[in-house]
Amino acid sequence: RYIGSPKVKETDRIRGFSEAEMEQMDRTGIVKDVRDNTIFLTFDDWGTDASINHLLYVLRKHHAKGTFFIITWNVKNNPNLLRAIAEDGHDIASHTNRHRPMVWQTSNYGGNMTPMTEEEYAEDVRLSYEELQKTVGDVMVDGKPALTHYFRPPTLAISKSGIRSIMDAGFSY
């Protein structure tokens, strides 16, 4: 299920979908079936050890939980930090392995990177989940796995072939 924003109709943010398919997408950004007054805290990418540890301290202090969308290329530098995030009770989700965009926009990264093929993107998504599984796949929090099947695309832009890669890899959101 795609949960997006009103910007999903901008042609440089979405590729390969027909008008009818785009009309069926949830562009409200609202997650259904949650309690009133629920706030979702989500964190993308990866930071320094110091910044992540400070963030974990603040979340612990306020008894708050979040979802961390992880660029797994960075996990190799400190897998124990990812385990600490999971063991603190936060959901772990994928933000790809290399943070390469699914849809190429001229504004992405100043145009310094080349887009990936559909096969390369599928491999990047697969590698991302594999690294997360290897690092935190055994962590359980309150009886449920810390590792989720959530995915957030870099730059939040999507394409039909990218969505196919994500769903084929077993992601649900």
What is the role of each PLM region?
Residues 120:
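Surface-exposed acidic loop/strand-edge motifs in secreted or periplasmic proteins
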Residues 2-116, 127-149:
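Active-site beta->alpha N-cap acidic-glycine motif
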Residues 162-173:
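His/Asp/Glu-enriched short active-site or ligand-binding loop at hydrolase and phosphoryl-transfer sites
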